[in-house]
Amino acid sequence: MASSSPVTPGLMSVVFGIVPVIVAWLYSEYLHYAKYSVSAKTRHSDVNLVEIAKDFVKEDDKALLIEDGGGLQSASPRAKGPTTHSPLIRFVLLDESFLVENRLTLRAIIEFAVLMVYFYICDRTDVFNSSKKSYNRDLFLFLYFLLIIVSAITSFTIHTDKSPFSGKAIMYLNRHQTEEWKGWMQVLFLMYHYFAAAEYYNAIRVFIACYVWMTGFGNFSYYYIRKDFSLARFAQMMWRLNFLVIFSCIVLNNSYMLYYICPMHTLFTLMVYGALGIMSKYNEMGSVIAAKFFACFVVVIIVWEIPGVFEWIWSPFTLLMGYNDPAKPQLPLLHEWHFRSGLDRYIWIIGMLYAYYHPTVESWMDKLEEAEMKFRVAIKTSVALIALTVGYFWYEYIYKMDKLTYNKYHPYTSWIPITVYICLRNITQSFRGYSLTLLAWLGKITLETYISQFHIWLRSGVPDGQPKLLLSLVPDYPLLNFMLTTSIYVAISYRLFELTNTLKTAFIPTKDDKRLVYNTISALIICTCLYFFSFILITIPQKLV
Protein backbone atom coordinates (compact mmCIF):
# COMPACT_ATOMS: atom_id res chain seq x y z
CA MET A 1 0.00 0.00 0.00
CA ALA A 2 1.76 3.13 -1.24
CA SER A 3 1.00 6.50 0.29
CA SER A 4 0.97 9.79 -1.60
CA SER A 5 1.19 11.85 1.58
CA PRO A 6 4.23 12.03 3.90
CA VAL A 7 3.94 11.17 7.57
CA THR A 8 3.51 14.46 9.40
CA PRO A 9 3.82 15.31 13.10
CA GLY A 10 0.07 15.87 13.15
CA LEU A 11 -0.71 12.43 11.76
CA MET A 12 1.77 10.76 14.09
CA SER A 13 0.27 12.68 17.03
CA VAL A 14 -3.14 11.23 16.22
CA VAL A 15 -1.67 7.72 16.06
CA PHE A 16 0.10 8.10 19.39
CA GLY A 17 -3.00 9.62 20.94
CA ILE A 18 -5.37 6.89 19.80
CA VAL A 19 -3.26 3.95 21.07
CA PRO A 20 -4.03 4.43 24.80
CA VAL A 21 -7.68 5.07 23.92
CA ILE A 22 -7.80 1.72 22.10
CA VAL A 23 -6.33 -0.01 25.14
CA ALA A 24 -8.80 1.70 27.48
CA TRP A 25 -11.74 0.91 25.20
CA LEU A 26 -10.85 -2.79 24.88
CA TYR A 27 -10.44 -3.03 28.63
CA SER A 28 -13.79 -1.28 29.21
CA GLU A 29 -15.52 -3.69 26.82
CA TYR A 30 -13.96 -6.62 28.66
CA LEU A 31 -15.10 -5.23 32.02
CA HIS A 32 -18.59 -4.65 30.67
CA TYR A 33 -18.71 -8.18 29.25
CA ALA A 34 -17.53 -9.64 32.54
CA LYS A 35 -20.16 -7.66 34.42
CA TYR A 36 -22.85 -8.80 31.98
CA SER A 37 -21.76 -12.44 32.33
CA VAL A 38 -21.97 -12.27 36.11
CA SER A 39 -25.39 -10.62 35.91
CA ALA A 40 -26.60 -13.27 33.46
CA LYS A 41 -25.48 -16.10 35.72
CA THR A 42 -27.18 -14.47 38.66
CA ARG A 43 -30.40 -14.10 36.71
CA HIS A 44 -30.31 -17.77 35.73
CA SER A 45 -30.09 -18.68 39.40
CA ASP A 46 -33.23 -16.57 40.02
CA VAL A 47 -31.57 -14.61 42.80
CA ASN A 48 -32.74 -10.99 43.09
CA LEU A 49 -33.79 -11.05 39.43
CA VAL A 50 -35.70 -7.77 39.31
CA GLU A 51 -33.20 -5.72 41.30
CA ILE A 52 -30.24 -6.88 39.23
CA ALA A 53 -32.00 -6.09 35.96
CA LYS A 54 -32.89 -2.60 37.16
CA ASP A 55 -29.35 -1.96 38.29
CA PHE A 56 -27.91 -3.18 35.00
CA VAL A 57 -30.12 -0.88 32.94
CA LYS A 58 -29.43 2.03 35.24
CA GLU A 59 -25.66 1.62 34.94
CA ASP A 60 -25.86 1.35 31.15
CA ASP A 61 -27.92 4.53 30.96
CA LYS A 62 -25.39 6.34 33.10
CA ALA A 63 -22.67 5.39 30.67
CA LEU A 64 -24.60 7.32 28.04
CA LEU A 65 -25.15 10.44 30.09
CA ILE A 66 -21.68 11.03 31.59
CA GLU A 67 -22.13 13.43 34.46
CA ASP A 68 -23.42 16.76 33.13
CA GLY A 69 -21.81 16.14 29.75
CA GLY A 70 -18.51 17.00 31.36
CA GLY A 71 -16.14 14.85 29.39
CA LEU A 72 -14.73 11.51 30.44
CA GLN A 73 -15.73 11.41 34.07
CA SER A 74 -17.59 9.43 36.66
CA ALA A 75 -21.37 9.20 36.36
CA SER A 76 -22.30 6.86 39.15
CA PRO A 77 -22.52 8.01 42.75
CA ARG A 78 -21.70 4.44 43.77
CA ALA A 79 -18.61 4.25 41.57
CA LYS A 80 -15.64 2.69 43.24
CA GLY A 81 -12.09 3.83 42.93
CA PRO A 82 -10.33 7.17 43.30
CA THR A 83 -13.30 9.40 42.56
CA THR A 84 -11.43 12.41 43.91
CA HIS A 85 -9.00 12.19 40.99
CA SER A 86 -9.58 14.07 37.77
CA PRO A 87 -11.06 12.19 34.80
CA LEU A 88 -7.69 12.35 33.01
CA ILE A 89 -5.88 10.73 35.95
CA ARG A 90 -8.54 8.04 36.24
CA PHE A 91 -8.17 7.35 32.52
CA VAL A 92 -4.38 7.02 32.77
CA LEU A 93 -4.73 4.73 35.79
CA LEU A 94 -7.32 2.60 33.92
CA ASP A 95 -9.78 3.00 36.76
CA GLU A 96 -12.27 0.18 36.19
CA SER A 97 -15.46 1.95 37.25
CA PHE A 98 -14.49 5.00 35.22
CA LEU A 99 -13.84 2.95 32.08
CA VAL A 100 -17.12 1.06 32.37
CA GLU A 101 -19.07 4.27 32.86
CA ASN A 102 -17.46 5.89 29.80
CA ARG A 103 -17.38 2.81 27.60
CA LEU A 104 -19.71 4.30 24.98
CA THR A 105 -17.66 7.48 24.73
CA LEU A 106 -14.48 5.47 24.24
CA ARG A 107 -16.27 3.42 21.60
CA ALA A 108 -17.33 6.62 19.81
CA ILE A 109 -13.72 7.86 19.77
CA ILE A 110 -12.52 4.59 18.27
CA GLU A 111 -15.26 4.59 15.64
CA PHE A 112 -14.35 8.15 14.68
CA ALA A 113 -10.69 7.12 14.39
CA VAL A 114 -11.61 4.18 12.15
CA LEU A 115 -13.52 6.53 9.83
CA MET A 116 -10.52 8.85 9.68
CA VAL A 117 -8.40 5.85 8.67
CA TYR A 118 -10.90 5.16 5.89
CA PHE A 119 -10.55 8.80 4.78
CA TYR A 120 -6.78 8.33 4.57
CA ILE A 121 -6.93 5.01 2.73
CA CYS A 122 -9.37 6.32 0.13
CA ASP A 123 -7.59 9.58 -0.62
CA ARG A 124 -3.93 9.06 0.22
CA THR A 125 -3.16 5.48 -0.82
CA ASP A 126 -3.44 3.34 -3.94
CA VAL A 127 -5.69 0.74 -2.32
CA PHE A 128 -8.64 1.96 -4.39
CA ASN A 129 -8.69 3.16 -7.97
CA SER A 130 -9.71 6.56 -9.24
CA SER A 131 -11.59 7.64 -12.34
CA LYS A 132 -12.17 10.85 -14.27
CA LYS A 133 -15.25 13.02 -13.94
CA SER A 134 -17.75 13.03 -16.78
CA TYR A 135 -20.70 15.36 -17.26
CA ASN A 136 -23.92 14.53 -19.07
CA ARG A 137 -26.74 17.01 -18.59
CA ASP A 138 -29.46 14.44 -19.20
CA LEU A 139 -28.04 12.02 -16.62
CA PHE A 140 -27.39 14.82 -14.14
CA LEU A 141 -30.97 16.11 -14.23
CA PHE A 142 -32.41 12.58 -14.35
CA LEU A 143 -30.65 11.57 -11.13
CA TYR A 144 -31.58 14.76 -9.34
CA PHE A 145 -35.26 14.75 -10.23
CA LEU A 146 -35.44 11.02 -9.54
CA LEU A 147 -34.35 11.78 -5.98
CA ILE A 148 -36.97 14.54 -5.70
CA ILE A 149 -39.72 12.19 -6.94
CA VAL A 150 -38.66 9.38 -4.61
CA SER A 151 -38.54 11.87 -1.71
CA ALA A 152 -42.03 13.14 -2.54
CA ILE A 153 -43.45 9.62 -2.75
CA THR A 154 -41.80 8.22 0.37
CA SER A 155 -41.28 11.14 2.75
CA PHE A 156 -43.93 13.78 2.08
CA THR A 157 -44.96 15.05 5.52
CA ILE A 158 -47.52 17.56 6.77
CA HIS A 159 -46.37 19.40 9.89
CA THR A 160 -48.66 21.05 12.42
CA ASP A 161 -46.06 22.70 14.65
CA LYS A 162 -47.02 25.89 16.45
CA SER A 163 -45.15 29.16 16.08
CA PRO A 164 -43.09 30.12 19.17
CA PHE A 165 -44.21 33.72 18.65
CA SER A 166 -47.95 33.51 18.04
CA GLY A 167 -48.70 29.97 19.18
CA LYS A 168 -50.53 29.37 15.91
CA ALA A 169 -49.76 27.04 13.02
CA ILE A 170 -48.25 29.76 10.82
CA MET A 171 -44.87 28.02 10.45
CA TYR A 172 -43.22 30.79 8.42
CA LEU A 173 -39.63 29.67 7.73
CA ASN A 174 -39.98 26.74 10.12
CA ARG A 175 -37.18 24.30 10.92
CA HIS A 176 -38.57 21.51 8.72
CA GLN A 177 -38.63 23.89 5.78
CA THR A 178 -35.08 25.20 6.23
CA GLU A 179 -33.68 21.68 6.70
CA GLU A 180 -35.40 20.61 3.48
CA TRP A 181 -34.03 23.73 1.79
CA LYS A 182 -30.51 22.81 2.84
CA GLY A 183 -31.07 19.23 1.71
CA TRP A 184 -32.09 19.84 -1.90
CA MET A 185 -29.39 22.48 -2.31
CA GLN A 186 -26.73 20.18 -0.87
CA VAL A 187 -27.63 17.40 -3.29
CA LEU A 188 -27.17 19.74 -6.26
CA PHE A 189 -23.99 21.15 -4.71
CA LEU A 190 -22.48 17.67 -4.33
CA MET A 191 -23.59 16.50 -7.77
CA TYR A 192 -22.03 19.66 -9.22
CA HIS A 193 -18.69 18.51 -7.80
CA TYR A 194 -19.09 14.84 -8.70
CA PHE A 195 -20.05 15.37 -12.33
CA ALA A 196 -18.08 18.61 -12.87
CA ALA A 197 -21.30 20.35 -13.91
CA ALA A 198 -19.65 23.69 -14.62
CA GLU A 199 -22.78 25.19 -16.18
CA TYR A 200 -24.36 25.39 -12.69
CA TYR A 201 -21.53 27.47 -11.21
CA ASN A 202 -23.71 30.53 -10.62
CA ALA A 203 -26.42 28.41 -9.00
CA ILE A 204 -23.85 26.96 -6.58
CA ARG A 205 -22.79 30.49 -5.63
CA VAL A 206 -26.42 31.22 -4.75
CA PHE A 207 -26.69 28.00 -2.72
CA ILE A 208 -23.63 28.89 -0.66
CA ALA A 209 -25.13 32.34 -0.08
CA CYS A 210 -28.27 30.60 1.18
CA TYR A 211 -26.20 28.63 3.71
CA VAL A 212 -24.53 31.81 4.94
CA TRP A 213 -27.92 33.54 5.05
CA MET A 214 -29.13 30.71 7.29
CA THR A 215 -26.09 31.22 9.52
CA GLY A 216 -27.15 34.81 10.11
CA PHE A 217 -30.84 33.94 10.39
CA GLY A 218 -30.46 30.94 12.71
CA ASN A 219 -27.84 32.37 15.04
CA PHE A 220 -29.59 35.73 15.35
CA SER A 221 -32.88 33.99 16.15
CA TYR A 222 -31.24 31.88 18.85
CA TYR A 223 -29.26 34.64 20.56
CA TYR A 224 -31.99 37.26 20.27
CA ILE A 225 -34.74 35.03 21.68
CA ARG A 226 -32.86 32.88 24.21
CA LYS A 227 -30.23 35.44 25.21
CA ASP A 228 -27.80 32.59 25.80
CA PHE A 229 -24.29 33.95 25.32
CA SER A 230 -22.74 31.40 27.65
CA LEU A 231 -19.29 29.90 27.16
CA ALA A 232 -20.86 26.46 26.83
CA ARG A 233 -23.13 27.51 23.97
CA PHE A 234 -20.22 29.17 22.19
CA ALA A 235 -18.03 26.08 22.61
CA GLN A 236 -20.79 23.80 21.34
CA MET A 237 -21.20 25.88 18.20
CA MET A 238 -17.46 25.95 17.51
CA TRP A 239 -17.26 22.19 18.09
CA ARG A 240 -20.10 21.56 15.65
CA LEU A 241 -18.48 23.68 12.95
CA ASN A 242 -14.86 22.63 13.36
CA PHE A 243 -14.45 19.26 15.08
CA LEU A 244 -14.52 17.13 11.93
CA VAL A 245 -12.63 19.58 9.75
CA ILE A 246 -9.78 19.93 12.27
CA PHE A 247 -9.16 16.19 12.34
CA SER A 248 -9.48 16.01 8.55
CA CYS A 249 -6.78 18.68 8.27
CA ILE A 250 -4.50 16.88 10.73
CA VAL A 251 -4.90 13.36 9.36
CA LEU A 252 -4.74 14.33 5.68
CA ASN A 253 -2.27 17.23 6.01
CA ASN A 254 -4.67 19.71 4.45
CA SER A 255 -5.12 23.43 5.03
CA TYR A 256 -8.18 24.70 6.86
CA MET A 257 -9.12 26.76 3.80
CA LEU A 258 -9.45 23.68 1.59
CA TYR A 259 -12.81 23.24 3.31
CA TYR A 260 -13.64 26.92 2.85
CA ILE A 261 -17.27 26.68 3.95
CA CYS A 262 -16.16 25.78 7.50
CA PRO A 263 -14.06 28.93 8.10
CA MET A 264 -16.74 31.02 6.39
CA HIS A 265 -19.49 29.78 8.69
CA THR A 266 -17.18 30.08 11.68
CA LEU A 267 -16.35 33.70 10.84
CA PHE A 268 -19.94 34.79 10.27
CA THR A 269 -21.13 32.89 13.36
CA LEU A 270 -18.54 34.78 15.40
CA MET A 271 -19.69 38.06 13.88
CA VAL A 272 -23.33 37.37 14.75
CA TYR A 273 -22.27 36.34 18.26
CA GLY A 274 -20.25 39.52 18.65
CA ALA A 275 -22.97 41.75 17.22
CA LEU A 276 -25.60 40.52 19.67
CA GLY A 277 -23.28 39.65 22.55
CA ILE A 278 -21.83 43.15 22.90
CA MET A 279 -24.19 45.21 25.08
CA SER A 280 -26.63 42.29 24.94
CA LYS A 281 -28.85 43.70 27.70
CA TYR A 282 -29.90 46.49 25.32
CA ASN A 283 -30.94 44.18 22.47
CA GLU A 284 -34.61 44.81 23.20
CA MET A 285 -34.19 48.44 22.17
CA GLY A 286 -34.89 49.00 18.48
CA SER A 287 -32.39 51.84 18.23
CA VAL A 288 -29.60 49.64 19.60
CA ILE A 289 -30.38 46.83 17.17
CA ALA A 290 -30.48 49.34 14.30
CA ALA A 291 -27.09 50.67 15.38
CA LYS A 292 -25.71 47.13 15.49
CA PHE A 293 -26.96 46.38 11.99
CA PHE A 294 -25.41 49.62 10.77
CA ALA A 295 -22.12 48.76 12.49
CA CYS A 296 -22.09 45.33 10.80
CA PHE A 297 -22.47 46.93 7.38
CA VAL A 298 -19.74 49.46 8.18
CA VAL A 299 -17.33 46.71 9.28
CA VAL A 300 -17.96 44.72 6.09
CA ILE A 301 -17.50 47.80 3.90
CA ILE A 302 -14.23 48.71 5.60
CA VAL A 303 -12.77 45.20 5.54
CA TRP A 304 -13.85 44.02 2.10
CA GLU A 305 -14.47 47.15 0.04
CA ILE A 306 -11.39 49.22 0.89
CA PRO A 307 -8.30 47.81 -0.88
CA GLY A 308 -5.55 46.55 1.41
CA VAL A 309 -7.59 46.43 4.62
CA PHE A 310 -8.48 42.74 4.33
CA GLU A 311 -4.84 41.71 3.86
CA TRP A 312 -3.72 43.95 6.72
CA ILE A 313 -6.26 42.44 9.13
CA TRP A 314 -5.84 38.81 8.13
CA SER A 315 -2.10 38.62 7.43
CA PRO A 316 -1.31 37.69 11.08
CA PHE A 317 -3.60 34.67 10.61
CA THR A 318 -1.99 33.48 7.39
CA LEU A 319 -0.82 30.26 9.05
CA LEU A 320 -4.46 29.37 9.73
CA MET A 321 -6.27 30.97 6.78
CA GLY A 322 -3.61 30.69 4.10
CA TYR A 323 -4.05 28.23 1.25
CA ASN A 324 -1.78 27.28 -1.62
CA ASP A 325 -3.52 25.28 -4.33
CA PRO A 326 -0.91 22.95 -5.90
CA ALA A 327 -2.51 23.70 -9.28
CA LYS A 328 -2.21 27.49 -8.77
CA PRO A 329 0.98 28.10 -6.76
CA GLN A 330 1.31 31.67 -8.06
CA LEU A 331 -1.69 32.97 -6.08
CA PRO A 332 -1.18 34.76 -2.73
CA LEU A 333 -1.83 32.63 0.36
CA LEU A 334 -4.83 34.72 1.42
CA HIS A 335 -6.37 34.89 -2.05
CA GLU A 336 -8.77 31.99 -1.49
CA TRP A 337 -9.95 33.33 1.87
CA HIS A 338 -10.42 36.83 0.46
CA PHE A 339 -12.35 35.53 -2.54
CA ARG A 340 -14.60 33.07 -0.68
CA SER A 341 -15.46 35.27 2.29
CA GLY A 342 -15.95 38.29 0.04
CA LEU A 343 -18.58 36.63 -2.13
CA ASP A 344 -20.99 36.37 0.82
CA ARG A 345 -19.84 39.27 2.95
CA TYR A 346 -23.27 40.92 3.20
CA ILE A 347 -25.75 38.07 3.10
CA TRP A 348 -25.26 37.03 6.74
CA ILE A 349 -26.45 40.51 7.76
CA ILE A 350 -29.50 40.11 5.52
CA GLY A 351 -30.19 36.85 7.34
CA MET A 352 -30.05 38.70 10.66
CA LEU A 353 -32.45 41.34 9.35
CA TYR A 354 -34.93 38.69 8.22
CA ALA A 355 -34.66 37.01 11.62
CA TYR A 356 -35.30 40.29 13.42
CA TYR A 357 -38.44 40.95 11.41
CA HIS A 358 -39.55 37.32 11.47
CA PRO A 359 -42.17 37.86 14.26
CA THR A 360 -43.52 40.92 12.45
CA VAL A 361 -43.93 39.10 9.15
CA GLU A 362 -45.47 36.14 10.94
CA SER A 363 -48.03 38.40 12.59
CA TRP A 364 -48.91 39.87 9.18
CA MET A 365 -49.39 36.36 7.83
CA ASP A 366 -51.55 35.50 10.82
CA LYS A 367 -53.82 38.47 10.13
CA LEU A 368 -53.90 37.60 6.44
CA GLU A 369 -55.08 34.06 7.18
CA GLU A 370 -57.97 35.52 9.20
CA ALA A 371 -59.01 37.95 6.44
CA GLU A 372 -61.76 37.38 3.90
CA MET A 373 -61.13 34.86 1.14
CA LYS A 374 -61.08 37.39 -1.74
CA PHE A 375 -58.65 39.69 0.03
CA ARG A 376 -56.43 36.77 1.05
CA VAL A 377 -56.30 35.36 -2.48
CA ALA A 378 -55.61 38.80 -3.97
CA ILE A 379 -52.68 39.48 -1.62
CA LYS A 380 -51.12 36.05 -2.08
CA THR A 381 -51.52 36.21 -5.84
CA SER A 382 -49.91 39.65 -5.92
CA VAL A 383 -46.98 38.49 -3.79
CA ALA A 384 -46.46 35.44 -6.00
CA LEU A 385 -46.60 37.48 -9.21
CA ILE A 386 -44.18 40.09 -7.88
CA ALA A 387 -41.78 37.40 -6.67
CA LEU A 388 -41.90 35.57 -9.99
CA THR A 389 -41.37 38.80 -11.93
CA VAL A 390 -38.40 39.84 -9.80
CA GLY A 391 -36.99 36.32 -10.05
CA TYR A 392 -37.35 36.34 -13.83
CA PHE A 393 -35.49 39.64 -14.24
CA TRP A 394 -32.76 38.49 -11.85
CA TYR A 395 -32.37 35.28 -13.87
CA GLU A 396 -32.29 37.07 -17.21
CA TYR A 397 -29.99 39.96 -16.32
CA ILE A 398 -27.86 38.65 -13.44
CA TYR A 399 -27.80 34.87 -13.31
CA LYS A 400 -27.03 34.41 -17.02
CA MET A 401 -23.78 36.37 -16.79
CA ASP A 402 -20.50 34.52 -17.22
CA LYS A 403 -19.09 33.41 -13.89
CA LEU A 404 -16.38 36.06 -13.61
CA THR A 405 -18.85 38.88 -14.22
CA TYR A 406 -21.47 37.24 -12.02
CA ASN A 407 -19.03 37.02 -9.11
CA LYS A 408 -18.72 40.82 -9.16
CA TYR A 409 -22.48 41.26 -8.77
CA HIS A 410 -23.12 38.31 -6.48
CA PRO A 411 -22.38 39.99 -3.09
CA TYR A 412 -24.97 42.68 -3.84
CA THR A 413 -27.66 40.57 -5.53
CA SER A 414 -27.67 37.15 -3.81
CA TRP A 415 -30.47 38.30 -1.48
CA ILE A 416 -32.85 38.52 -4.48
CA PRO A 417 -33.22 34.78 -5.29
CA ILE A 418 -33.26 34.00 -1.56
CA THR A 419 -36.15 36.39 -0.97
CA VAL A 420 -38.01 35.11 -4.03
CA TYR A 421 -37.69 31.53 -2.79
CA ILE A 422 -38.87 32.45 0.71
CA CYS A 423 -41.92 34.25 -0.68
CA LEU A 424 -42.94 31.38 -2.95
CA ARG A 425 -42.18 28.64 -0.40
CA ASN A 426 -44.34 30.35 2.24
CA ILE A 427 -47.12 31.65 0.01
CA THR A 428 -49.88 29.57 1.67
CA GLN A 429 -50.23 28.08 5.12
CA SER A 430 -50.63 24.55 3.78
CA PHE A 431 -47.64 24.85 1.43
CA ARG A 432 -45.28 26.05 4.14
CA GLY A 433 -46.46 23.19 6.36
CA TYR A 434 -45.30 20.54 3.88
CA SER A 435 -41.80 19.12 3.68
CA LEU A 436 -39.94 16.18 2.20
CA THR A 437 -38.31 14.61 5.24
CA LEU A 438 -35.74 12.68 3.19
CA LEU A 439 -34.32 15.96 1.94
CA ALA A 440 -34.63 17.43 5.44
CA TRP A 441 -32.62 14.48 6.78
CA LEU A 442 -29.92 15.18 4.21
CA GLY A 443 -30.08 18.83 5.23
CA LYS A 444 -29.05 17.92 8.78
CA ILE A 445 -25.77 16.40 7.66
CA THR A 446 -24.67 19.03 5.15
CA LEU A 447 -21.44 19.80 7.02
CA GLU A 448 -20.42 16.14 7.13
CA THR A 449 -21.31 15.49 3.49
CA TYR A 450 -19.41 18.61 2.47
CA ILE A 451 -16.19 17.57 4.23
CA SER A 452 -16.41 13.85 3.48
CA GLN A 453 -16.94 14.32 -0.25
CA PHE A 454 -13.31 15.41 -0.68
CA HIS A 455 -11.93 12.07 0.47
CA ILE A 456 -14.41 9.17 0.27
CA TRP A 457 -16.49 10.19 -2.76
CA LEU A 458 -14.02 12.26 -4.74
CA ARG A 459 -10.22 12.14 -4.65
CA SER A 460 -7.40 14.65 -4.69
CA GLY A 461 -4.52 12.33 -3.83
CA VAL A 462 -2.25 15.09 -2.52
CA PRO A 463 -2.34 17.52 0.41
CA ASP A 464 -4.38 20.66 -0.33
CA GLY A 465 -5.33 19.38 -3.77
CA GLN A 466 -8.76 20.06 -5.21
CA PRO A 467 -10.69 16.80 -5.77
CA LYS A 468 -10.37 16.45 -9.53
CA LEU A 469 -10.92 12.67 -9.59
CA LEU A 470 -13.59 10.23 -8.43
CA LEU A 471 -13.11 7.37 -5.98
CA SER A 472 -13.56 4.16 -7.97
CA LEU A 473 -14.64 1.03 -6.10
CA VAL A 474 -16.19 -0.57 -9.20
CA PRO A 475 -13.86 0.22 -12.11
CA ASP A 476 -15.34 0.56 -15.60
CA TYR A 477 -18.90 0.69 -14.24
CA PRO A 478 -19.48 4.41 -13.55
CA LEU A 479 -23.14 4.17 -12.51
CA LEU A 480 -22.63 1.13 -10.28
CA ASN A 481 -19.62 2.88 -8.79
CA PHE A 482 -21.71 6.01 -8.23
CA MET A 483 -24.36 3.95 -6.44
CA LEU A 484 -21.90 2.11 -4.19
CA THR A 485 -19.63 5.02 -3.30
CA THR A 486 -22.62 7.29 -2.67
CA SER A 487 -24.24 4.77 -0.33
CA ILE A 488 -21.05 4.38 1.70
CA TYR A 489 -20.40 8.12 1.62
CA VAL A 490 -23.84 9.11 2.91
CA ALA A 491 -23.81 6.40 5.60
CA ILE A 492 -20.40 7.51 6.87
CA SER A 493 -21.45 11.17 6.79
CA TYR A 494 -24.43 10.36 8.98
CA ARG A 495 -22.26 8.42 11.42
CA LEU A 496 -19.83 11.34 11.59
CA PHE A 497 -22.77 13.64 12.34
CA GLU A 498 -23.85 11.40 15.23
CA LEU A 499 -20.32 10.90 16.54
CA THR A 500 -19.67 14.65 16.49
CA ASN A 501 -22.74 15.24 18.64
CA THR A 502 -21.95 12.30 20.93
CA LEU A 503 -18.43 13.53 21.62
CA LYS A 504 -19.66 17.10 21.97
CA THR A 505 -22.00 15.96 24.74
CA ALA A 506 -19.16 14.07 26.40
CA PHE A 507 -16.53 16.79 26.38
CA ILE A 508 -18.51 20.04 26.53
CA PRO A 509 -20.61 20.35 29.70
CA THR A 510 -23.66 22.56 29.39
CA LYS A 511 -23.68 24.08 32.88
CA ASP A 512 -20.16 23.70 34.21
CA ASP A 513 -17.75 26.31 32.83
CA LYS A 514 -15.04 25.16 35.22
CA ARG A 515 -15.17 21.66 33.80
CA LEU A 516 -15.23 23.08 30.27
CA VAL A 517 -12.09 25.13 30.91
CA TYR A 518 -10.43 22.08 32.48
CA ASN A 519 -11.27 19.94 29.46
CA THR A 520 -9.97 22.62 27.08
CA ILE A 521 -6.68 23.12 28.92
CA SER A 522 -6.18 19.36 29.25
CA ALA A 523 -6.77 18.89 25.52
CA LEU A 524 -4.32 21.67 24.64
CA ILE A 525 -1.61 20.24 26.90
CA ILE A 526 -2.06 16.71 25.57
CA CYS A 527 -2.08 17.86 21.93
CA THR A 528 1.00 20.03 22.44
CA CYS A 529 2.94 17.20 24.08
CA LEU A 530 1.95 14.69 21.41
CA TYR A 531 2.86 17.07 18.60
CA PHE A 532 6.22 17.99 20.15
CA PHE A 533 7.09 14.33 20.68
CA SER A 534 6.03 13.43 17.13
CA PHE A 535 7.94 16.38 15.68
CA ILE A 536 11.13 15.22 17.38
CA LEU A 537 10.70 11.62 16.18
CA ILE A 538 10.27 12.78 12.58
CA THR A 539 12.89 15.55 12.56
CA ILE A 540 15.83 13.80 14.22
CA PRO A 541 16.12 10.90 11.72
CA GLN A 542 15.93 13.39 8.82
CA LYS A 543 18.85 15.40 10.24
CA LEU A 544 20.92 12.28 10.83
CA VAL A 545 20.68 11.26 7.17
UniProtKB/Swiss-Prot annotation:
Stored InterPro entries: Cas1_AcylTrans_dom (IPR012419)
Membrane association type: Multi-pass membrane protein
Single GO MF annotation: oxidoreductase activity
EC number(s) per entry: 2.3.1.-
UniProt keyword annotation of Hydrolase present: no
Localization (cell): Golgi apparatus membrane; Endoplasmic reticulum membrane
Phosphoserine, modified sites: S45
Keywords (A to Z) from UniProt: Endoplasmic reticulum, Glycoprotein, Golgi apparatus, Membrane, Oxidoreductase, Phosphoprotein, Transferase, Transmembrane, Transmembrane helix
Gene knockout outcome: Decreased levels of acetylated cell wall polymers and lower amounts of acetic acid in single mutant. Increased tolerance toward the necrotrophic fungal pathogen Botrytis cinerea. Severe growth phenotypes (e.g. dwarf and abnormal flower organs) associated with reduction in the secondary wall thickening and the stem mechanical strength in the quadruple mutant rwa1 rwa2 rwa3 rwa4 and characterized by reduced xylan acetylation and altered ratio of non-methylated to methylated glucuronic acid side chains. Absence of interfascicular fibers and xylem cells differentiation.
Expression (tissue specificity): Expressed in cells undergoing secondary wall thickeningin a SND1-dependent manner, such as xylem cells. Slightly elevated in the inflorescence stems. Mainly observed in leaves and inflorescence stem tops, but present ubiquitously.
GO cellular-component term (any): Golgi apparatus
GO BP, one annotated term: xylan biosynthetic process
Transmembrane segments: 7-27, 108-128, 139-159, 184-204, 205-225, 238-257, 258-278, 293-313, 346-366, 378-398, 438-458, 470-490, 521-541
Sugar attachment sites: N129, N426
One Pfam family this sequence matches: Cas1_AcylT
Top EC class for this record: transferase
Predominant place of localization: Golgi
Family: Belongs to the PC-esterase family. CASD1 subfamily.
Function noted in UniProt: Probable O-acetyltransferase involved in the acetylation of cell wall polymers (both pectic and nonpectic polysaccharides) and of xylan during secondary wall biosynthesis. Catalyzes the O-acetylation of xyloglucan. Seems required for infection by the necrotrophic fungal pathogen Botrytis cinerea.
Name by which UniProt lists this protein: Protein REDUCED WALL ACETYLATION 2
Organism, as annotated: Arabidopsis thaliana
The gene coding this protein: RWA2
